[in-house]
Amino acid sequence: MVTVGNYCEAEGPLGPAWAQNGLSPCFFFTLVPSTLMALGALALVLVLPCRRRDVPSGTEELFWAADSRVAPYALQLFLATLQVALPLAGLAGRVGTARGVRLPGYLLLASMLGSLASACGLWLLVAERRQARQSLAMGVWMKFRHSSGLLLLWTVAFAAENLALVSWNSPQWWWARADLGQQVQFGLWVLRYVISGGLFILGLWAPGLRPQSYTLRVHEADQDVERNQAQSTDRTSTWRDLGRKLRLLSSYLWPRGSPALQFIVLICLGLMGLDRALNVLVPIFYRDIVNLLTSKAPWSSLAWTVTTYVFLKFLQGGGTGSTGFVSNLRTFLWIRVQQFTSRGVELRLFSHLHELSLRWHLGRRTGEVLRVVDRGTSSVTGLLSYLVFNIIPTLADIIIGIIYFSMFFNAWFGLIVFLCMSLYLFLTIVVTEWRAKFRRAMNTQENITRARAVDSLLNFETVKYYNAEGYEVERYREAIIKYQGLEWKSSASLVVLNQTQNLVIGLGLLAGSLLCAYFVSEQKLQVGDFVLFGTYITQLYMPLNWFGTYYRMIQTNFIDMENMFDLLKEETEVKDVPGAGPLRFHKGQIEFENVHFSYADGRETLQDVSFTVMPGQTVALVGPSGAGKSTILRLLFRFYDISSGCIRIDGQDISQVTQISLRSHIGVVPQDTVLFNDTIANNIRYGRIAAGDSEVEAAAQAAGIHDAILSFPEGYETQVGERGLKLSGGEKQRVAIARTILKAPDIILLDEATSALDTSNERAIQASLAKVCTNRTTIVVAHRLSTVVSADQILVIKDGCIIERGRHEALLSQGGVYAEMWQLQQKGQETVSEDSKPQDIA
């Protein structure tokens, strides 16, 4: 009968690793299978959530063709299956040749872990082939290679078989083939070498992932539908683009350009290493105190040991390393680094938002964008803190604990700690990955809820106009209910995770404590060793209890980073060409030559638009709504790039000069003036930030708003409110004119600047605008034709084309579209005048 003896051949700890001219078999066959099992589990965790769940529909026929690459994949599958069975066959061989000898425990561990690791590789091999078939069926292009986790697993397995050769001269191994047992083990090693080598070579080729390995028939009518379905599936694992995310984080971990902060980072990393040493030394000194007390040691030795223990405990903190002197010092020093990180991320995002095009901003909700910025900033700082000072130290403590118990106690203790910690981490990652979809859905609904509230409050007046308060509250209530439903799912899944973690920790502590108590009763360990084990394990489990929280927070931050990365990946639509120089302004001549432009929908907004504005002239753009008048102004300001043609200022193509220099010469007075939630003075000063108070007042006087400002209780320091809602329409328009006067541009663009005002305000502001436009090249978009009768040239635009051009009198004499528009507006004014006359009720 075969029985199991000590973990290693000789009773005692796992080490030394090197003995008798070779690696210790106990050490080798503990390290290698454990490493392979860890790699296999990690590969499963990272690859499983990333697998596409789409499957080909019934309108597709997918079958394997008899080509030259089916055989290599069949060989690969056969070798992977053999690799699963071989460790168990090796154990059976040892049992058959043992002949009454007690087998060491490490052989059982090596067989089980080796077989499980190979099973992970086999499952990944089949899963990746299935994913490749489904991806190609959807029309999704993919790289025909295995995942990094699977390749790493096969590489390490093959490297381990080669590593065994360094023990060729060791009598502990089977190279001599002196008896049947050694001959069997040598034969199994040859099989392992051939199998692992074959899988390594075939893995680099990946024959099962090649498109030639099968024939796909897809009905063309369904192909686009399936591709769209593939693109609309749920987002993949939070570990997608992990390398890119970590590279971004590392750039903020090491504060470039600040030697002082770099030195602080090094100090913090050193303090983190000191914390790891304290976590080992504190239980050791506690054990020594117990042993000294039980052995009735002299007071001098006991006092010194107790003093040292208390000092180390002071440095470490309350058993978790979270409240000790070292940890608090590290937290204090890290504040500046964290502020540097937060500032860098916020500035990068804010700068990127201003670099994006007007087209992008018009298609986004401001509330959602700001939420993405807030979450992205907090996610980067949180990730740095959790990864550097929580996750990495916790993993380091686990590895140190496994090594310590294996070397100084017994390999069974190291095995218990390893299995318990591995199972804990594996279940934590798997369950948390499962929870990720609930968190994502909750985040999406939170964005919707926030955007709905912001949209309603921004349109406060409109809500009041239509007595829609109840409707808005009901919409908001429905959004909150949806959010809370998703929040409940996320919280309930958290309870499942916590209970799973608690069960694993309890079982591991029970097994280790019973084993330690047994060895103490057998007098193989001292009472102090039992105390050390309990103290160390409890100390190890304390941060491990938080590992689930750390992982969840990291995953949450990665989820929050996804939207931030999407935002950062938005390409700038309008950007300066390489080598662009400043605009050299001379007189201000504007030329549009055969300009074509279309928005994202593909419909051409402007078609072959050509005109010239001479220096100092005023050109008016008139026509029906949607004709493309405002688009011309936006193209000149370069909010968009034209599809074809050319726009020049003083003979220079505006696409070849810097945007900053171009816009510094252009002033815009829009129809809907939006002011910042700041003082009137600062809103005017926005035209030229460096302007003094006297210049601001002079601009206000020129715009005809100085006296109105002085009538306010706080004068120029009056807050205008969000979007300038505290000012009337005419007052806001005059502030915008004053802002433009202060900028003193060479070219003026007026986009229906007075169309939303009453007649009296319109006339007053027209007078102010006339002062601004004197001796400046001006383009006016006008709705009321009476405001542009004195323009040097009037362009009539319809459906993106210039259909008429000339002065007011010439266009009237032509009797075309302009004359018709003029007559309609004149009749409208006459009707208003008649309606406004007092009537006799009697």
Curated annotation (Swiss-Prot):
Pfam families: ABC_membrane, ABC_tran, MTABC_N. GO terms for cellular component: early endosome membrane; endolysosome membrane; endoplasmic reticulum membrane; extracellular region; Golgi apparatus; Golgi membrane; lysosomal membrane; melanosome membrane. One of its GO terms (molecular function) is ATP hydrolysis activity. InterPro entries: AAA+_ATPase (IPR003593), ABC1_TM_dom (IPR011527), ABC1_TM_sf (IPR036640), ABC_transporter-like_ATP-bd (IPR003439), ABC_transporter-like_CS (IPR017871), ABCB6_N (IPR032410), P-loop_NTPase (IPR027417), Type_1_exporter (IPR039421). It comes from the Eukaryota. Keywords: ATP-binding, Cell membrane, Disulfide bond, Endoplasmic reticulum, Endosome, Glycoprotein, Golgi apparatus, Lysosome, Membrane, Mitochondrion, Mitochondrion outer membrane, Nucleotide-binding, Secreted, Translocase, Transmembrane, Transmembrane helix, Transport. It is found in: Cell membrane; Mitochondrion outer membrane; Endoplasmic reticulum membrane; Golgi apparatus membrane. Residues 1-26, 94-106, 169-185, 285-305, 397, 521-529 are lumenal. Its EC number is 7.6.2.5. The chain crosses the membrane at residues 27-47, 73-93, 107-127, 148-168, 186-206, 264-284, 306-326, 376-396, 398-418, 500-520, 530-550. Residues 265-556 form the ABC transmembrane type-1 domain. Contains two independently folding units, the N-terminal transmembrane domain (residues 1-205) and the ABC-core domain (206-842) are respectively responsible for the lysosomal targeting and the ATPase activity. Belongs to the ABC transporter superfamily. ABCB family. Heavy Metal importer (TC 3.A.1.210) subfamily. ATP-dependent transporter that catalyzes the transport of a broad-spectrum of porphyrins from the cytoplasm to the extracellular space through the plasma membrane or into the vesicle lumen. May also function as an ATP-dependent importer of porphyrins from the cytoplasm into the mitochondria, in turn may participate in the de novo heme biosynthesis regulation and in the coordination of heme and iron homeostasis during phenylhydrazine stress. May also play a key role in the early steps of melanogenesis producing PMEL amyloid fibrils. This is ATP-binding cassette sub-family B member 6. It comes from Mesocricetus auratus. The lineage of its organism: Eukaryota, Metazoa, Chordata, Craniata, Vertebrata. The gene is ABCB6.
